Amino acid sequence: MTIAPLSASPMQLSPSPAGQTGAAAQASAQTATPQAMAATAEAPGLAALQSVLAVARQSAASSQDGLAVLMANVLRATATGNLPPAVQSAVQQLMGLHLSTDKTPDADAVKNAMASSGLFTEATLAAGAEPPVDLKTALANLAREAERWLAKTPAQNQPQTQGASPNVPPPMRGGPPTAQSPAAPSLPENALPALTAKLLATGSEAALARQTLLQMASLPDANKPAESRWIFDVPLMTPQGAAVAQLIVQRDARGTSTESPEPVWRVGLAVDVEPLGPVRANLALSGGHAWVTIVADRAAALSKLQKDSSWLSDALALVARDGDIAFQSGNGATAPAGRLVNSAS
């Protein structure tokens, strides 16, 4: 994947906590800017705001789940051909937001995935724009239409489903990126419509709770208002089914030394698809230099990635970046030392 520094345009919108629209969303969008956060750092109501956010975070963490199981259920439900038109339309909107794996994603594809991640839904609405076509909007539409479908089922026929354990840990600020591998559907084959509606509704609500946590993890830190961080999930469609990668994009306030005073951009990526299995990549950009570290859990995957890494060297040279590339084993063993890529040579 060729990743260039992302422009500031999609990042000018600060993420807002879930459930805010209209005036509330506008107020949230305004107060979520780094400048406003710094200005209100000592405001009397800050403790109350932090308390509200803590309660909301705890509530979302207890009910969140990833997209992989929901998308697996969506694929199984779609295969029956029995979905009501409104539910089918909501399903198509959701599934249309996955990142294509037919070709190697470039920087524009990653930028578009970030813009449609759902991080900026309320901020976009507060700015007076049309409702965005993004993950959060699509999940809300599916949850609403699945609930309406379920409501048409007689109460005595509605299934009583047990709350399943989450398949992915909740996202937390400062944590590493976490991938979701393709999951088996929890929806049985030939399931009754009521059960299909129930699982689509509860799965969408759990994914929406996760969106809330992603937005909270992406809010500016009042103690570091000049630094920016965005964490978001990216659905993928693979031959094994629907998977979800996670990206963390971060901009430090300034460089780490007087020799490198420019801000440092950092990108963390986690993905878990066959045949490579769990893979994580970390990219740092400062000035004209790039540092890339690729970590794989499987020895065979690590060997293949290292063997096929010439494209990464070429990509760095193409954008005139000197670069250090290192490969590491996820089990603690370290691969042979990385190499220096000199774009001037």
Task: Report the location of each language-model feature.
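Extended non-catalytic alpha-helical interaction modules
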Residues: M1-P278, N282-S345
